[in-house]
Design a protein with these regions (language model features):
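Hydrophobic transmembrane alpha-helices of multi-pass solute transporters/permeases
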Residues: 1-235
Length: 235
């Protein structure tokens, strides 16, 4: 069970970007719709809306479809559900990298690279990356909870369920650690680094691509462990 839990630590680190680098990215984008200014942090509601919308869709639509092909009551196994969530998590990082790459190109074209100002690119372009993280939550977070409930010994079920939530804290620490390393390894020699105070001078897109690469590696490791894991109960 520990390898499955470990895979979710990086997943939680990716999810944490929604509260840190996504907000910074949004602050450096055009946030006005008419006279109304969208707070950059408020876009986290897209993730919440995605979860609210997709949980019933998964249970009422996807599970019956999966069940036809697999013959399993829950459609797919919990490791498979977690794996799908890990894939969408990686996709969110790729989406964020594409948005940031476009934002930097616009900053270059408008001569805003050395000015700490918002770039004329709508914050609405961030929508897909938040939505993809919501999809990832529906699959991986719920899948992890089901996995620990089904696979833990009866006498340790409460402890294992609590342990399953520890990945969120571990992921936040991992994210903070990775971000703290960015100035060390990416700044210097006249370069402001990937994530400077002025994002127009940085390369936040490279950070997102790095997280996507780590997520892809995480998927392969998780798949290797999951294929060798024998479920205690039919999922």
């Amino acid at each position: 069970m520990l390898p499955v839990w470990s895979a979710m630590v990086l997943f939680a680190a990716v999810q944490e970007q929604m509260f840190s680098t996504f907000v910074e990215q949004g602050t450096a984008m055009e946030r006005h719709i008419g006279s109304f200014e969208i707070p950059a942090a408020s876009f986290q509601c897209v993730d919440t809306i995605a979860v609210i919308m997709l949980v019933p869709v998964y249970e009422r639509v996807l599970v019956p479809v999966f069940r036809r092909f697999t013959g399993r009551p829950n459609g797919i196994t919990t490791p498979q559900r977690i794996g799908i969530g890990l894939f969408f998590s990686m996709s969110a990082m790729v989406s964020a990298a594409l948005v940031e790459s476009s934002r930097l190109q616009i900053a270059q074209a408008e001569g805003l690279v050395h000015r700490k100002v918002a770039v004329p690119m709508s914050i609405l372009w961030q929508g897909p990356q938040y939505f993809l993280l919501g999809v990832a939550e529906v699959f991986s977070n719920v899948g992890l909870t089901e996995f620990f409930y089904d696979e833990s010994p009866d006498a340790m079920r409460s402890l294992c369920m609590a342990f399953s939530l520890l990945n969120v804290s571990a992921g936040n620490y991992l994210s903070s650690f990775i971000l703290s390393l960015m100035p060390v390894f990416t700044a210097g020699g006249g370069s402001p680094g990937w994530i400077p105070d002025n994002l127009n001078e940085g390369h936040l897109d490279r950070f997102y691509l790095m997280m996507a690469g780590l997520s892809l590696l995480n998927i392969f490791i998780f798949a290797f462990c999951a294929m060798r894991y024998k479920c205690k109960k039919a999922s």
